[in-house]
């Protein structure tokens, strides 16, 4: 399993549009991809799961991936977080 922690830098946190971008990126991979925030873990391929967390600016989130293409998935999600201005 591979994982990485990010600090959310987007002023609006992770709301509908950025959540959709993350879900679309995660869904391109076969690996199981999860997002953990505030003690709760959700499937990052589920828009409802991600939205239910209410992730605000300044939050620390951990994205983990497990499976054959886990490193590719995690690298793509890291790039998405940075390119979309969501986190670092």
UniProtKB/Swiss-Prot annotation:
**Superkingdom of origin:** Bacteria
Q: Which InterPro entries match?
A: HPr, HPr-like, HPr-like_sf, PTS_HPr_His_P_site, PTS_HPr_Ser_P_site
Q: Which residues carry this modification: Tele-phosphohistidine?
A: 15
Pfam families cross-referenced by the UniProt entry: PTS-HPr
Q: Where in the cell is it found?
A: Cytoplasm
> Sites of the modification Phosphoserine?
12, 46
Q: How is its activity regulated?
A: Phosphorylation on Ser-46 inhibits the phosphoryl transfer from enzyme I to HPr.
One GO biological process this protein is involved in is: regulation of carbohydrate utilization
Which family does this protein fall into? Belongs to the HPr family.
Q: Which PANTHER family match?
A: PHOSPHOCARRIER PROTEIN HPR, PHOSPHOCARRIER PROTEIN NPR
By its UniProt entry, which NCBIfam families does this protein fall under? Answer: PRK13780.1, PTS_HPr_family
Protein name per the record: Phosphocarrier protein HPr
Please spell out the taxonomic lineage of the organism that makes this protein: Bacteria, Bacillati, Bacillota, Bacilli, Bacillales
């Amino acid at each position: 399993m591979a994982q990485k922690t990010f600090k959310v830098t987007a002023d609006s946190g992770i709301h509908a549009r950025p959540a959709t971008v993350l879900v679309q990126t995660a869904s391109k991979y076969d690996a199981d991809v999860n997002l953990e925030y505030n003690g709760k873990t959700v499937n990052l391929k589920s828009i409802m799961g991600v939205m239910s967390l209410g992730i605000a600016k300044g939050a620390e989130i951990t994205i983990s991936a497990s499976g054959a293409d886990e490193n590719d998935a995690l690298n793509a999600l890291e790039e998405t977080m940075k390119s979309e201005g969501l986190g670092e």
